């Protein structure tokens, strides 16, 4: 039915304006007297300083006429917000988003604007304050931490988070804290410990943020992402999130230790660490179906230390393996061995350097093909560069040994060896699928396409064939013969057959 019935003309116009960027909505004020103040009733406000202002300050030196225009534009925006936000006529400000780079924006102004939004029952608040170097942090009003209407809070860069001892955010479901500074370690912990309906949490730490330890113990949490930079003074972090479904960890701390207690509902994981916590992280997520692993440069040794450990990903179906200036063939091979049900593999080495023993390694592995290549891998994707020998050798290994592969996507950039790599992979893509497979593996593969009864009958052919039937992956028992010729002996033979075969 007609969705606008019952709206007055002004209400309808405000509704239409709410779908426009705030800057565009403000420009409509010159159309007529009716439109002059309509934008001041908008429930959602978004003010973005030009990113070029930030680049200008970081560049330094003399300024051109264009630079002066940018500065004047930023100054006008500051004066506009400072003048009009206190007079905003909407009784409820559903959303306020501020992105600020200019030094002219004072921390006290940001404090005032946030306080106005809180007084208007704000639901979503996003503040990014990134002035040039040396600017002091913006301290937000204490009323923010008792805002009952607040559902989403996103703070970034030069924000000082000072959580009072008594606070209440009963509606907060999304909390993003990106490279902010905390008044003390207890501020972060108080905030994390008293958000009882929180579902989405992002904590990205920076050097000098006044935090050494933190614990995420939130029963309602569904998504968790955290980042610890290499120079951060971290000692320990604890994670206890029984409802968590998505987990992203970027841990480059040199001294931090992790303790992960309970994540039984986890479905997807992204892990990138400096290496010393990788074993604990992977041991705690062995039951996930989707895993993305990012290997940063100069950390290959820490990761390959896992090679041979008894960690099995019994449920893993999707693996994304990304390397950056690193050589990690051994770790990738170990992951393939540890993932017997893997269906989709993506390998990204667009920015990697090759190890000297790449080709030798994958050729040595030809006699020990991972089970997932023989029975489950259906999709392989390689994103590489034209000089990547490691990626080429991996792709060759996959194409040569994957028995169930349905789709192979090869995307490589420019490089001296691009054409040679493409030609070689094309040959492997069209080659027969039994090259390099041992006789027993090949025979078992053939038997898997035959009815179980027929496969069993081959056991009388020779000693080599005697026990091959026990390695067949697909079993099918059919008592049709018992139904067409029912007798006690036929039923007994069938039961004995099944019992003997399953031993």
UniProtKB/Swiss-Prot annotation:
SMART domains named among the record's database cross-references: FBD
Pfam families: F-box, FBD, LRR_At5g56370
The F-box domain, residue ranges: 2-50
Domain FBD as annotated: residue spans: 361-412
Lineage top rank: taxon: Eukaryota
InterPro entries, alphabetized: F-box-like_dom_sf, F-box_AtFBL13-like, F-box_dom, FBD, FBL13/AtMIF1-like, LRR_dom_sf, LRR_FXL15/At3g58940/PEG3-like
PANTHER family (alphabetical): F-BOX/RNI SUPERFAMILY PROTEIN-RELATED, SUPERFAMILY PROTEIN, PUTATIVE-RELATED
Protein name stated in the entry: Putative FBD-associated F-box protein At5g56410
Organism: Arabidopsis thaliana (Mouse-ear cress)
């Amino acid at each position: 039915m007609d969705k606008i019935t019952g709206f007055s003309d002004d209400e309808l116009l405000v509704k239409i304006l709410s779908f426009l960027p705030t800057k565009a909505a403000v420009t409509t004020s010159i159309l007529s007297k009716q439109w002059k103040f309509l934008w001041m009733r908008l429930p959602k406000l978004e003010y973005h300083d030009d990113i070029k202002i930030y680049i200008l300050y970081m560049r330094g030196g003399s300024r051109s006429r264009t630079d002066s225009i940018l500065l004047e534009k930023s100054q006008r925006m500051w004066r506009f917000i400072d003048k009009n936000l206190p007079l905003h006529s909407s009784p409820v400000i559903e959303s306020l988003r501020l992105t600020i780079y200019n030094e002219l924006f004072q921390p006290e102004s940001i404090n005032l604007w946030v306080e106005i939004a809180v007084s208007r029952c704000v639901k979503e608040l996003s503040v990014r304050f990134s002035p040039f170097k040396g600017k002091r942090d913006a301290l937000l009003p204490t009323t923010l931490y008792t805002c009952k209407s607040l559902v989403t809070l996103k703070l970034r860069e030069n924000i000082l988070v000072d959580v009072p001892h008594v606070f209440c955010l009963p509606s907060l479901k999304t909390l993003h804290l990106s490279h902010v500074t905390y008044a003390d370690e207890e501020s972060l912990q108080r905030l994390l410990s008293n958000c009882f309906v929180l579902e989405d949490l992002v904590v990205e730490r920076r050097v000098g943020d006044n935090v050494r330890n933190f614990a995420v113990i939130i029963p309602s949490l569904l998504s968790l992402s955290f980042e610890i930079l290499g120079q951060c003074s971290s000692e320990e972090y604890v994670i206890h999130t029984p409802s968590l479904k998505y987990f992203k960890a970027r841990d480059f701390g040199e001294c931090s230790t992790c303790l992960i207690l309970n994540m039984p509902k986890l479905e997807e994981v992204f892990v990138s660490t400096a290496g010393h916590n990788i074993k604990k992280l992977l041991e705690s997520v062995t039951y996930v179906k989707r895993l993305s692993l990012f290997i940063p440069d100069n950390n290959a040794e820490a990761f390959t230390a896992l090679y041979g450990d008894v960690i099995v990903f019994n449920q893993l179906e999707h693996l994304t393996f990304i390397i950056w200036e690193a050589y990690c063939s051994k770790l990738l091979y170990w992951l393939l061995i540890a993932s017997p049900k893997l269906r989709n593999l993506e390998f990204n080495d667009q920015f990697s350097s090759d190890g000297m023993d790449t080709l030798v390694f994958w050729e040595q592995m030809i006699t020990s093909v991972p089970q997932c290549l023989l029975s489950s891998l259906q999709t392989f994707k390689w994103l590489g560069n034209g000089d990547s020998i490691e990626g080429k050798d991996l792709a060759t290994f996959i194409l040569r040994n994957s028995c169930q592969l349905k789709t192979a996507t090869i995307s490589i950039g420019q490089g001296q060896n691009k054409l040679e790599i493409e030609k070689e992979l094309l040959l492997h893509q069209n080659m027969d699928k039994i090259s390099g497979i041992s006789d027993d593996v090949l025979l078992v593969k053939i038997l898997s396409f035959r009815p179980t009864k027929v496969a069993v009958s081959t056991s009388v052919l020779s000693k080599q064939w005697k026990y091959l039937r026990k390695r067949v992956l697909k079993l099918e028992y059919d008592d049709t013969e018992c139904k067409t010729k029912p007798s006690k002996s036929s039923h007994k033979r069938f039961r004995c057959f099944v019992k003997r075969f399953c031993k």
